[in-house]
Amino acid sequence: METTTTKKPYEVVVLMHPDASLEEQKDLFKKNKATIESYKGSINSLETWGKRTLATPIGKLKKAIYFHSTFEADTQAIAELERTMRINDKVLRFMHTRLDERTSLGKFMEGFKKGLAESAAREKEREAKAAARKAAFAAAKAERSERYDKGE
């Protein structure tokens, strides 16, 4: 009986130890690329999001290096990728997510980047409003302080 394996689209987010060297980071993704290609898969994109603060600490670590990748592979490749990432001490967390097969990876990445840009714009807007509130509060406090000094 012949089994056919079909490539399915996936994305993965990997959190690496903040002290991981550039060489260790490259080695991990070279191994991942080799694993995917050995199962006749292909990598669509790999992005480094850099060192970011974690929402909740992992052990005593408050920061991690984030990576995001999209690729096509079969389920056996995913099992092997997860096995190798569990072994690697520098990988703190990872999550593979199977994407909708009806959407091409290119379209997915366009939508993903658009969502990131919108999220960043909302965050900037929130920060600007917070800064304006802080400035208004400081001005009101200074005014009250002046009136108090004058004895009003």
UniProtKB/Swiss-Prot annotation:
GO BP terms: translation
Tagged with keyword Ribonucleoprotein: yes
Molecular function via GO: small ribosomal subunit rRNA binding; structural constituent of ribosome
Source organism superkingdom: Bacteria
The keyword Cytoplasm is annotated on this UniProt entry: no
GO cellular component, one term: cytoplasm
Alphabetized SUPFAM superfamilies for the sequence: Ribosomal protein S6
Key words of the record: Ribonucleoprotein, Ribosomal protein, RNA-binding, rRNA-binding
Similarity comment text for this entry: Belongs to the bacterial ribosomal protein bS6 family.
PANTHER family, sorted: MITOCHONDRIAL 28S RIBOSOMAL PROTEIN S6 (PTHR21011), SMALL RIBOSOMAL SUBUNIT PROTEIN BS6M (PTHR21011:SF1)
Task of the protein: Binds together with bS18 to 16S ribosomal RNA.
Protein's name in the database: Small ribosomal subunit protein bS6
